[in-house]
Every structure is written in structure tokens, then in C-alpha cells.
């Protein structure tokens, strides 16, 4: 039974992480342009690097521009959480929980909510017990 909960938890976390990929992409016309953009971003602004590399900021890349870079945007992540990670990711599970109050479904639903909380707050889970001294 614990194995099922673990598998469901991993599935839920992968669904949560997949939600991040709805944000804008930096689309580049070639590998060379993408690499140039990535190196440029170490020191310069996004706008400057797009201008120099020929890349574009877009939700969808133009045909043939398959070299997309997903931007890690805290605003997009926070917005997703504000809109309701639990509603969008755990909604089907909550419906199942309402129709079948089994222990596995209840546990998976709790894990989903916990995963959303950790994801949205960028927290980590502290293991139980006293801290170990190095």
C-alpha cells in the first residue's frame, strides 16, 4: 500500500512540475544562437541578449525554431499557485476522493496538497528527528 502512495506521489509531483512549462519561452533560430543567448544571460539583460543573439520571447516558437529555452520565472510560478495548484493538479483526485473514500485515495490527495504547498512556497521537507552534527 505504501508503494502505491509513493507512486501516486511521484505522479502528482511530475504533474505539478509539468505545470511550470506553461510560461513563456525564449525561441532561438539555431543552436549557435541559443548558446550565445545562454552565455550572454550570465552578465546581461534578457532584452540585450535577445537583440544580440536573434532570439525571441514568445509563448510559441516560429516554425523551424525548435531551440526553445524555458525561462525560470518566479512570477509565473507564483501566479500558478495563486490560481490554485490544488484545483488544477489535484482536482481529479479530489473528485475521486469524494466518490470513493478509500485510504489510498485519501493519502494520495493529501500528498498532492502537500506537494503543491512545497512547490508553491519553494520549501523543503525537514526529516523527523534531531539534526545531525557534522
Curated annotation (Swiss-Prot):
A Pfam cross-reference name: Thionin
Main location per the UniProt record: secreted
Tissue: Detected in rosette leaves and at a very high level in flowers and in siliques.
GO cellular component terms listed in the entry, alphabetical order: extracellular region
Residue ranges of the propeptide: 68-134
Localisation: Secreted
Keywords: Disulfide bond, Plant defense, Secreted, Signal, Toxin
Protein name: Thionin-2.1
Gene name, Swiss-Prot/TrEMBL: THI2.1
